[in-house]
Amino acid sequence: MRSIWTGSVSFGLINIPIKMFSAVQESSLDMDMLDKKDNANIKFKRVNENTGKEVDFANIVKGYMLNDKYVILDDSDFEAADAIKTKTIDIESFVLEKEIESIYYEQPYYLEPDKGAMNAYGLLRDALQASGKVGVTRFVLRNKESLAILKPYKNVIVLNRIRFEQEIRSTDELNLPPISKKATKEMDMAEKLIDQLTEKFDITGFKDEYTTKLLDIIKKKAKGKVQKTAPKMKVVHKQGDDLMSMLKASLETKKKKSS
């Protein structure tokens, strides 16, 4: 793996040099865009809007439009905005992970101790494990400030980027039913169905089946085999009075599968 960021984790007066690596990889197939006429690859170029000429990457700068005029920024400007956060992951507090709603989670990264940091890294990892808490921190990655938590995962410390509160869109514009705690027959049946389908979560039991099937189609097409037309799926809108019968049928279906 290639590190995407180097810096340090600040834990009180302890400074832990680390390297950061992406913890995830895409499972989807890498598709290329081609010209329909001859299957030639489509290439995208960086061109000058005024001249239409291609611009070398070395000659491209970043700018911010202010009062109808661009202000050009370089690396030193981004660092000057907060030099500490560009190189330091400063733990500001510790919280219980259950206090953080799942909607805030964004991207996980592995942290690896750099030279001479094994003991301090191990101490932080093991202390987090023993406390059952996560560290809340902020740092700058790719010229953007990120909020994140630090938590142990197996034998590594994971930094999981989380979204700021202002990044979460309001639900006010959605047409939603009111929340009800009223006891009804439908609620009782729904809870029974949930109980029937409850099991211990095992991530190894879930695979990207769509990608596997798509790759199978690609291999068959490469051999000249004709693919069957996929059935058209329609969304069926059921009325409220169908809920009870559908819940009963779902429970019976589960019972038959279990027997």
UniProtKB/Swiss-Prot annotation:
GO terms (BP aspect): DNA recombination; double-strand break repair via nonhomologous end joining
Statement: the UniProt record of this protein carries the keyword DNA repair: yes
Keyword DNA-binding listed: yes
Domain Ku: 9-187
InterPro entries tied to this protein: Ku70/Ku80_beta-barrel_dom, Prok_Ku, SPOC-like_C_dom_sf
Any one GO MF annotation of this record: double-stranded DNA binding
Keywords: DNA damage, DNA recombination, DNA repair, DNA-binding
Biological function: With LigD forms a non-homologous end joining (NHEJ) DNA repair enzyme, which repairs dsDNA breaks with reduced fidelity. Binds linear dsDNA with 5'- and 3'- overhangs but not closed circular dsDNA nor ssDNA. Recruits and stimulates the ligase activity of LigD.
Family: Belongs to the prokaryotic Ku family.
HAMAP family in the cross-refs: Prokaryotic_Ku
PANTHER family for this protein: NON-HOMOLOGOUS END JOINING PROTEIN KU (PTHR41251:SF1)
Complex formation: Homodimer. Interacts with LigD.
Protein name: Non-homologous end joining protein Ku
